A protein has these predicted regions:
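A cytosolic small-molecule/anion-sensing beta-strand core signal
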Residues: 49
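Structural signature of FAD isoalloxazine-binding scaffolds in flavoprotein oxidoreductases
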Residues: 1-4
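Long, positively charged amphipathic alpha-helical accessory segments at protein N-termini or as interdomain linkers
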Residues: 9-11, 15-45, 55-195
Length: 195
């Protein structure tokens, strides 16, 4: 699903919309799981920096931003029906159908999921436009996977390792590297070490 937005904030703050969208997807996924599974059956769900939604260790959604003139296209893909098992960025894909009671029976319809997603996206987008990245960052960190854990980050041809220490106000991963320096990671593929 792609949504065209015309943010009223400066362009250098548009990065935050990937965090906004991932929070919206996460909330809808959790809501769907809570409706159909007992609390004991609900697998771990969370956010993987910078923009993936993870359920039971698998990637259920990713977010892509694209600037188009004075607008921003927010693309969100969510796996509802079963997906082909391929290793993508060190995370195996997963779909709601993989953890749904009775398999794919009574899965949410894409239209219903999209409607719920657009509602949550509007909520978080409004909050961002009114209050900035701070509240988005705080909520994202509450749901972050690998925070405080030792990770490896593939940045182009280089691999950095250290502890995922924090999320910068510019959306960067703050990595306390093995030499004790804080690195500001702007892009990369994150993998938990020792797992």
């Amino acid at each position: 699903l792609s949504v065209l937005l015309r943010p009223s904030v400066p362009v250098d703050q548009w990065f935050a919309l990937s965090f906004v969208a991932s929070l919206a997807v996460l909330e809808v996924v959790r809501s769907q799981l809570a409706t159909h599974l007992s609390s004991a059956e609900i697998p771990q769900t969370g956010l993987k920096w910078p923009n993936d939604v993870i359920v039971a260790g698998g990637k259920i959604s990713g977010i892509l931003l694209e600037v188009e003139g004075k607008a921003l296209i927010v693309g969100s893909g969510v796996n509802i029906a079963p997906v082909r098992r391929v290793d993508s960025q060190n995370i195996v894909p997963i779909a709601l159908a993989d953890i749904w009671p009775d398999g794919a029976h009574d899965l949410p319809q894409p239209y219903d999921f999209a409607t719920a997603y657009l509602d949550r996206l509007a909520f978080w987008y409004d909050r961002f436009c009114q209050s900035g990245f701070g509240p988005i960052r705080d909520t994202w960190l509450e749901n972050a996977l690998f925070l405080g854990q030792h990770v490896a980050v593939q940045c182009d041809a280089k691999v950095l390792s250290g502890v995922f220490h924090d999320l910068g106000m510019d959306g960067t991963m703050l990595l306390l590297d093995d030499s004790g320096q804080t690195r500001h990671i702007t892009t990369g593929d994150v993998k938990l070490l020792g797992s």
